[in-house]
């Protein structure tokens, strides 16, 4: 081997060793934060989390090729890993306002806690060998929300089923774990449907655990995060997080899902502007206008005026117009209760039970 070839070989070897050392450092740093979060949330008694190597992830996504990008704003890729289709989530520092590593580890930790439930996007494992941990999840499709393609619009039966199953998932977060977990970002982009038509809730980066014996957590106004048009007023204005934070967001989701009065889906706000400031500046927030409009239409008996015609057609000719109105009014009245526009705000378990009842109506 001549001197030139030897020099080239040494450089490649040095670069390879440097990359391996860096990945090992990331693995240790990321693993430490993840372990701390698991201990905080469940005293370390969590399900085992499978880890994948960086090489496996890069091969599965073709080096994170844009052609495999499923959701651009939160960097979700499709891939093939160990002979099965998967979704691979790779966040970046500028996706979140702050604490990116902690948020990604929270996503992994909560996902591992709920993966046994069919209505959550199942975590298959993670990779800690990148600067930001990468999640590997079962493959599912995003729900076609507010699509301009009429062929992709979901029929009534599918919409009510998805709504019911997401309500069940949120109720599970609130009641079935060792500590009450508040999702804080229930919105369409975080909902998937698998090949069997089962709805899956995902993305727990902003999930907040309420301490044992407490019913709320309060964060500083500049720490309020989420999707603006789905934020509960109290949370946006004061930083107070309760179970009703999710109930409100779910109510807005129902309103957007069953009418053609769509809200605007915003990503997290810019680093130099808090959601509190953005909320305060936006005096007639979209979800308030939607709820008020729905309330007015219900009172005036004009429900059909705000419904998606394709969805109405999908309810079938065997149903009378009166029966269709009854079912839709029940859903919309439930949504208004969730947003505080009609009577007492229900808990998510009650919401799930009511949606089951509406689904069974014949």
Swiss-Prot record:
The active site is at residue 185. One of its GO terms (biological process) is cell surface receptor signaling pathway. The keyword Nucleotide-binding applies. Residues 35-362 form the Protein kinase domain. Its EC number is 2.7.11.1. ATP binds at residues 41-49, 89. The keyword Translocase does not apply. Residues 1-23 are annotated as: Disordered. Keywords: ATP-binding, Kinase, Nucleotide-binding, Transferase. InterPro entries: Kinase-like_dom_sf (IPR011009), Prot_kinase_dom (IPR000719), Ser-Thr/Tyr_kinase_cat_dom (IPR001245), WAK-like (IPR045274). It catalyses: L-seryl-[protein] + ATP = O-phospho-L-seryl-[protein] + ADP + H(+); L-threonyl-[protein] + ATP = O-phospho-L-threonyl-[protein] + ADP + H(+). It comes from the Eukaryota. GO terms for molecular function: ATP binding; protein serine kinase activity; protein serine/threonine kinase activity. GO terms for cellular component: cytosol. Belongs to the protein kinase superfamily. Ser/Thr protein kinase family. ZRK subfamily. This is Serine/threonine-protein kinase ZRK4. The gene is ZRK4.
């Amino acid at each position: 081997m001549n001197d030139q070839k030897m020099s080239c070989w040494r450089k490649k070897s040095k670069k390879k060793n440097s990359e391996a050392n860096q990945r090992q450092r990331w693995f240790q740093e990321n693993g430490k934060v993840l372990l701390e979060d698991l201990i905080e949330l469940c005293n370390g008694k969590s399900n085992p989390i499978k880890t994948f190597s960086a090489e496996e992830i890069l091969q599965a996504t073709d080096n994170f090729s844009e052609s495999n990008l499923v959701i651009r704003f939160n960097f979700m890729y499709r891939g093939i890993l160990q002979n099965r289709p998967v979704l691979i989530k790779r966040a970046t520092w500028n996706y979140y306002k702050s604490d990116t590593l902690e948020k990604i580890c929270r996503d992994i930790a909560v996902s591992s806690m709920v993966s046994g439930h069919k209505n959550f996007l199942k975590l298959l494992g993670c990779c800690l060998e990148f600067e930001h941990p990468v999640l590997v999840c079962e493959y599912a499709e995003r729900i076609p929300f507010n699509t301009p393609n009429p062929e992709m619009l979901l029929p009534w039966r599918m919409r009510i089923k998805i709504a019911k199953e997401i309500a069940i998932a949120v109720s599970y977060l609130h009641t079935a774990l060792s500590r009450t977990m508040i999702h804080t970002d229930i919105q369409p982009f975080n909902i998937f449907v698998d090949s069997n038509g089962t709805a899956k809730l995902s993305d727990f980066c902003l999930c907040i655990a309420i301490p044992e014996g407490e019913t709320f957590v309060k964060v500083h106004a500049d720490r309020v995060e989420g999707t603006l048009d789905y934020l509960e007023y109290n949370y946006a204005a004061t930083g107070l997080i309760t179970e009703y934070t999710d109930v409100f967001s779910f109510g807005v989701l129902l309103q957007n899902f069953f009418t053609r009065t769509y809200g605007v889906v915003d990503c997290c706000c810019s680093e130099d502007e808090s959601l509190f400031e953005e909320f305060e500046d936006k005096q007639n927030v979209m979800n308030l206008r939607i709820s008020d409009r729905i309330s007015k239409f219900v009172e005036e008996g004009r429900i059909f005026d705000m419904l998606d015609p394709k969805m109405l057609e999908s309810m079938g000719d065997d149903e009378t117009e009166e029966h269709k109105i009854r079912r839709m009014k029940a859903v919309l009245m439930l949504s208004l209760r969730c947003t505080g526009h009609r009577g007492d705000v229900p808990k998510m378990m009650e919401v799930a039970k009511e949606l089951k009842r509406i689904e069974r109506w014949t």
